[in-house]
Amino acid sequence: MKTSVFVLVLGLVLLFAVSFATEMEESARECGKFMWKCKNSNDCCKDLVCSSRWKWCVLASPF
């Protein structure tokens, strides 16, 4: 009986930890700073673009 209660509590704690980590990852999205990995320019901060060759946030070219 004690073992099953312990396993149940441990399972609930793990479920809470995983769901909390997933929520933090979704809500704590920052914009990509200079030389951060990116998939598109929306991932980068203002005045930076995602390099199509290297997939890093770089300064936008004035040309």
From Swiss-Prot:
Inhibits sodium channels Nav1.7/SCN9A and potassium channels Kv11.1/KCNH2. Also binds the voltage-sensor domain of the potassium channel KvAP (from the archaeon Aeropyrum pernix) with very slow apparent binding kinetics and affects channel gating. Reaches its target by dynamically partitioning into anionic or zwitterionic headgroup lipid membranes. May bind to the open state of KvAP. Belongs to the neurotoxin 10 (Hwtx-1) family. 63 (VsTx1) subfamily. Expressed by the venom gland. Residues 1-21 form the signal peptide. GO terms for cellular component: extracellular region. It comes from the Eukaryota. Negative results: does not inhibit potassium channels Kv1.1/KCNA1 (IC(50)>200 uM), Kv1.4/KCNA4 (IC(50)>200 uM), Kv11.2/KCNH6 (IC(50)=45 uM) and Kv11.3/KCNH7 (IC(50)=55 uM) and sodium channels Nav1.1/SCN1A, Nav1.2/SCN2A, Nav1.3/SCN3A, Nav1.4/SCN4A, Nav1.5/SCN5A, Nav1.6/SCN8A. Disulfide bonds join C31-C45, C38-C50, C44-C57. GO terms for molecular function: ion channel inhibitor activity; potassium channel regulator activity; sodium channel regulator activity; toxin activity. This is Kappa-theraphotoxin-Gr3a. InterPro entries: Huwentoxin-1 (IPR011696), Huwentoxin_CS1 (IPR013140). Residues 22-29 form a propeptide. The presence of a 'disulfide through disulfide knot' structurally defines this protein as a knottin. Keywords: Disulfide bond, Ion channel impairing toxin, Knottin, Neurotoxin, Potassium channel impairing toxin, Secreted, Signal, Toxin, Voltage-gated potassium channel impairing toxin, Voltage-gated sodium channel impairing toxin. It is found in: Secreted. It comes from Grammostola rosea.
